[in-house]
Amino acid sequence: MANNYKKIVLLKGLEVINDYHFRIVKSLLSNDLKLNPKMKEEYDKIQIADLMEEKFPGDAGLGKLIEFFKEIPTLGDLAETLKREKLKVANKIESIPVKGIIPSKKTKQKEVYPATPACTPSNRLTAKGAEETLGPQKRKKPSEEETGTKRSKMSKEQTRPSCSAGASTSTAMGRSPPPQTSSSAPPNTSSTESLKPLANRHATASKNIFREDPIIAMVLNATKVFKYESSENEQRRMFHATVATQTQFFHVKVLNINLKRKFIKKRIIIISNYSKRNSLLEVNEASSVSEAGPDQTFEVPKDIIRRAKKIPKINILHKQTSGYIVYGLFMLHTKIVNRKTTIYEIQDKTGSMAVVGKGECHNIPCEKGDKLRLFCFRLRKRENMSKLMSEMHSFIQIQKNTNQRSHDSRSMALPQEQSQHPKPSEASTTLPESHLKTPQMPPTTPSSSSFTKKDETHPGAQSSPANFRITSPTVAPPLSSDTSTNRHPAVP
């Protein structure tokens, strides 16, 4: 039975709380579980549950968990839920010795009453068949006819109270008793009729089980409105947001775009009639969002804001259980576009992981080095491989790599600047040529011999204007004032 307690601790206790409350639990259990600082930082919920099972073999630490949750205001309801689950397991343990005695009583009843009491139509038919088999025995032994009649009446009376008992049991568990049908009706009819409303009730309960009281929270951020395809194959619009109270933060799926004007950064709002799963809220058409009054304002602690902005490490995501919802900003390493899906490989210093985008997340314009901000992606594990899968409400926001863009633009502009440099100096390079052609210049001068030497070392240098610009960079400015300088350019 300790395993049943551990299931409650892990699946209904640790799994549904957020990271902040989980850190509180680890801190409170550090002495009992002998957790060092590194273990408190790195151990996940599964590892803590294993240690709790070893330390508290009786109830796997469920009692401790209930005590902690009672002290946290936002986890009071969860503490009551865990308390009820613990009582259920305790009742099962107490009923084990009783079950060992019941079979002997049943065997005695079977000896006295051939028809076993039951509510199902198949058992009713069995009881009827048992009565029919008693018929020949009655004819063979007339002396026992009255006794057989009494027994058949007693068996019928036994079946009726058992049905009413079953009905009361189902009513106590929150379900209406199944409809009673005659023995002539087919067995499948009653079973299908009773199962359909039961399934509908379970589906309704699963939708409404996460309803919470109104909360007052500050808006930290909100995305733009985007399109998504509903389960009815209809194009609808929504947006994501992040809000925070004084004790924790929540990711919000807002399915009513008319509420977009309410979700303004740093605004205090009141959200009511919403649904909640772990630290994820869903606001729809039936929800209500209003601005808080002046007396309801508060400041969100910096630690909460820092944790809301914290990006999960990829190696930590690999350790999470399948179904874990992921939000975060990751670097794109590669992108593979298929016909219906796109594989985005994200990477950080701790590892890499594949992100499968489909629907609105398929083939989004991005390239290596860009950052992908993922909203509401679900972790899936198969054959020791972890992937982030896009779902109906998933969204990808692209942050372009501005550093790479600016570097590329500078590298592209550099050749253009070099090609444009000779243009403003063309006048200075052509002017010496015109002065060299003037009749005032003697045919043979020392400067001409110097140019001849220049040509010998660098053939074709005289025909290149750039060569003149390099050898006599200061020739052009004094043209208007000193012509002698132009006639005899300085040779370096």
From Swiss-Prot:
Keywords: Cell cycle, Nucleus, Tumor suppressor
Record keyword rRNA processing present: no
Pfam families: HIN, PYRIN
Amino acid composition bias (Basic and acidic residues), ranges on this chain: 142-159
Swiss-Prot/TrEMBL induction comment: By IFN-alphas and IFNG/IFN-gamma in hematopoietic cancer cells.
Bias (Polar residues) ranges: 160-173, 416-432, 460-492
Domain Pyrin: residue ranges: 1-88
Gene3D superfamilies in UniProt: Death Domain, Fas, Nucleic acid-binding proteins
UniProt xrefs under InterPro entries: DAPIN (IPR004020), DEATH-like_dom_sf (IPR011029), HIN-200 (IPR040205), HIN200/IF120x (IPR004021), NA-bd_OB-fold (IPR012340)
Entry's Gene Ontology molecular function annotations: double-stranded DNA binding; ubiquitin protein ligase binding
SUPFAM superfamilies linked to this entry: HIN-2000 domain-like
Low complexity compositional bias, start-end: 181-194
Positions of the UniProt region annotated as Disordered: 106-199, 400-492
GO cellular component: cytosol; nuclear speck; nucleolus; nucleoplasm; protein-containing complex
Any one of the GO BP annotations: positive regulation of protein localization to nucleus
PROSITE patterns, A to Z: DAPIN, HIN_200
Top-level taxon: Eukaryota
Segments forming domain HIN-200: 199-399
Subunit structure: Interacts with MDM2.
Function: Major mediator of the tumor suppressor activity of IFN in breast cancer cells. Promotes ubiquitination and subsequent degradation of MDM2, which leads to p53/TP53 stabilization. Promotes ubiquitination and subsequent degradation of HDAC1, which in turn enhances maspin expression, and impairs invasive activity of cancer cells.
Domains: entry comment: The HIN-200 domain mediates interaction with MDM2.
Family: Belongs to the HIN-200 family.
Protein name (database record): Pyrin and HIN domain-containing protein 1
